[in-house]
Regions:
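C-terminal regions of mature proteins
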Residues: 206-208, 316, 331-333, 354, ...
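Active/ligand-binding-proximal structured segments within catalytic/core domains
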Residues: 30, 39-87, 278-292, 299-302
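M16/insulysin-pitrilysin zinc metalloprotease superfamily fold
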Residues: 109-140, 294-295, 320-378
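Histidine-acidic residue clusters that define the catalytic metal-binding segment
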Residues: 20-25, 164-205, 238-243, 270-274, ...
């Protein structure tokens, strides 16, 4: 770690965090543009975020959003197949893309004087992707192989997939981003083109440019390259089916001979961050850190790993940056000789004790300091800032929400954390899953 960075973080922890240097504007065709200045190095990150993800797919076409992400690296009228990434590499940069339930994003990291070229190429494929049947056949096999390796070949991923399907019986968050295999196998060229032509348009996108740039320069380049693109009149409102009230806890046991380290996971339905109202999500963020954010001092680790010595590891997770309600989760992996049933019982006892007594005040203060440090480190690179703002804006939050978030986290009280804990940590609102070798079954 550089000493200058350490000193800067210590100074920031002692007082209010510095505001990001952000400029925003919208082109006439509806493209939202965010410019984040960071002049420490002559480099720039360009990201284009589309407000379309796996939870927005038409029924029966699971995986089409991720499939299209792969196909976007095929050719256009002006660029041959595979030339996009090759050109980025020839200019000393890197590029990639990713898909979630709520968005699909593409990025390039290059020298600042290559931004003009990157915008030209990214704007070109926004509305002029050309696909052949061979392109689709080849890339469909690629995503099927990806599913085989990352999901079907990994018992933990299969458990996560089954738990999401059990948690979200009506909402599309229960459908895997990569897709169900039988639907992936049927995805066609026309499916991809229909999804692309309807949703990949300036009025459904956010352009983030972060690095050694000036807002006026970015505006001129955006007008030059993205400005002429026609908006889409086929973008649908993000009105997804919502979950009915969950009236009873749900359980599943996945047995797989490949499992060498059994564990249990419980996920509770939990609210998302909402624009202008982020306090409950902030309280849940602090709660996750208190319960399982540290392998030595968190509530679960201290009680299960060190005091009772029944767990090898434990964790808690929550990320409310989503369009709709998502999950708050707990993980526990027992030591050899302790059954999953006993580990679950111990976990429940620890959670019940926490709900009764609340957090240790000194630990609560330490957690907030650690959260503040993590926020500062997360904003320390242009690429990190681009991703931070892009993700938030893609799910309906605002620039102000992003800038307010660190101070909202710091202002959360113990009472707010405990109120959120009592509301969310309800067994009737949860799915509990066991991942185990074939010899251990549910009690």
């Amino acid at each position: 770690m550089h000493r200058s960075l350490t000193a800067a973080c210590l100074l920031a922890l002692a007082g209010p965090a510095l505001a990001d240097d952000v400029t925003t504007f919208t082109l006439e065709n509806g493209l939202d543009v965010v410019v984040i200045e960071d002049h420490r190095a002559p480099a720039v990150t360009q990201m284009v975020w589309y407000r379309i993800g796996a939870a927005d797919e038409p029924p029966g076409h699971s995986g089409i959003a991720h499939f299209l992400e792969h196909l976007m690296f095929q050719g256009t009228d002006d660029m041959a197949e595979g030339a996009f990434s090759a050109t980025v590499e020839e200019n000393g940069g890197t590029d990639n893309a990713f898909t979630s339930w709520d968005y699909t994003a593409y990025f390039q990291r290059v020298a600042a004087d290559r931004l003009d070229l990157m915008m030209k190429m990214e704007a070109d494929r926004m509305r002029d992707l050309q696909l052949t049947e061979d392109d689709v056949t080849t890339e469909r096999q690629v995503i099927l192989e990806e599913r085989s390796q990352r999901t079907d070949g990994d018992p933990g991923s299969l458990l996560n997939e089954q738990m999401a399907a059990a948690q979200f019986m009506n909402h599309p968050y229960g459908i895997p981003v990569i897709g169900w295999r039988h639907e992936m196998e049927a995805l066609s060229r026309q499916d991809a083109l229909d999804f692309y032509q309807a949703n990949y348009a300036p009025n459904n996108a956010i352009l983030i440019v972060a690095g050694d740039v000036q807002p006026d320069e970015v505006r001129a380049l955006a007008e030059k390259h993205y400005g002429p693109l026609a908006p889409s009149n086929r973008i649908k409102p993000r009105e997804r089916p919502q979950e009915p009230p969950q009236l009873a806890g749900r359980r599943l046991v996945m047995q797989d001979e490949r499992v060498s380290e059994p564990y249990l996971v419980r996920s509770y339905l939990a609210p998302e961050r909402n624009t202008g109202d982020q306090r409950k999500a902030a309280a849940l963020t602090i709660l996750a850190e208190l319960l399982g954010g540290n392998q030595t001092s968190s509530v679960l680790a201290r009680n299960l790993q060190f005091d009772r010595k029944v767990a090898v590891w434990s964790a808690a997770f929550y990320d409310g940056t989503s369009v709709d309600p998502d999950t708050f989760g707990l993980y526990v992996s027992p030591v050899p000789g302790v059954s999953l049933a006993d580990a679950e019982k111990a976990m429940d006892e620890v959670i019940a004790g926490f709900l009764e007594s609340g957090p240790d005040p000194a630990q609560f203060a330490r957690i907030k300091t650690q959260v503040r440090a993590a926020e500062i480190y997360g904003r320390d690179s242009a690429g990190g800032l681009a991703r931070l703002y892009g993700q938030a804006l893609s799910v309906g939050l605002t620039v102000q929400d992003v800038q307010d978030w660190p101070e909202v986290l710091q202002s959360i009280t113990e009472d707010e954390v405990m109120a959120a804990a009592r509301d969310v940590l309800n067994r009737d609102n949860a799915v509990t899953g066991w991942l185990t070798p074939p010899q251990e079954t549910a009690q």
